[in-house]
Amino acid sequence: LMVGSSSRVAWSWQLNLKRTATRPTEASHKMSIDSAVIRRDFPIFGSEVNGKPLVYLDSANTSQKPNVVIDTMTKFMREAYAPINRSAYTLAANATEQYEGARAAVAKFINANNAREIVFTKNATEALNMIAFSWGRANLQRGDVVLLTHMEHHANIVPWQMLQQERGIELRWVPLTSDFQLDLSSLETLLAGVKVFSFTSMSNVLGTINPVEKLCAAAHAAGAIAIVDMCQSVPHAPTDVRASGADFAMFSSHKMCGPSGVGVLWGREALLEAMPPFLGGGNMISEVRLDGFTCAELPSKFEAGTPPIVEVIGLGAAVNYLTGVGMQNVRQHEIALSNYVLDLLQSRFGDDITIHGPRNPELRGATFSFAFRGIHPHDLSQVLDQSNVCVRAGHHCAKPLMKIIGANATTRASFYLYNTTEDADALADALDSASDIF
């Protein structure tokens, strides 16, 4: 058993056909939703930079916002803004109703047992820290083991490392296979004696979709709780937290057409009831005395202070918007689009491009990290920007994974429900332009 192994595995699937100017046919990659119609819901796509249309391929970082979210938030601030859970006057009561309505919408969206299981946080990073430091401090002692994977975002690594420094817990790691999947061949051994198994549902670098139900079941069989970082999957596919087997899950509003500044922690009610509060102050108490305090009921127990009221209401609008589109439609659209992107890059660039991630679009999300002709990712992203193609360049808050795949940085293009095959074509054309420069 290797704990915290930094062994380097050099692999990727490499596109190795001759470079041509052909494009895959759209008929062979039929989309399940009409992105041209969807795009009309997003006002930013009516804008141009230097006379060129926006090609936004950074949705794994943050998504664009539809009119309904913008309008809902603006209308609330103009006509209905008031504090929640504090005042009896009509304006405040109506604001509270809208806020709690958003909570109910989120609960339904992920099939939670009830709205009490939905805790609003600043973002998913705060939610992960809340579990590590609230649940973790109450339940983990020196020598206890937390199992993570090599494909985690820093938000699911650093809090546990901080707890390791504070409490002396042990960290173990699930390695990767050569085809960018989790290596589950030794999972039973790795889970021996583990108290927590915390993992991502989908890699923000590789696009790999992990078998959440299988991993949660394995964790429970070993006597561990299962924590799932769902930031990259909730915006892109149907989510059923009850069926997943997870004990805790978290995701962020801004990646799913909602505003920044609000995230969601979902937890099984019994676990949340037993977990001590993370922050103290107003709203999270039912009584305060000179000799102590009594916590409020769920979920207020974990929502100290004035929350991001407008942002939560915006998240509710985003959830309703995505529900209207249909999350299965979003998933099928991205499978077809992923297939188109992979075929396009293969036919255009052959072995000039190396994509780090599964080749099968059924096993991945529409997030593609790649190396191109030895051009530094930061240089490449700046050249792509000249064509108004927006991509991410860097380590993507996953430095341990970068080391494992043998890259200091990659260029990442990530697609969403509003992206089209024309966006993929624009990416390929911009890469051609970069070839001419470098």
What are the residue ranges of the model-derived segments?
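N-terminal leader/targeting segments
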Residues: 3-4, 33
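Short, low-complexity intrinsically disordered segments enriched in A/P/G/S/L with frequent Arg
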Residues: 5, 19-27
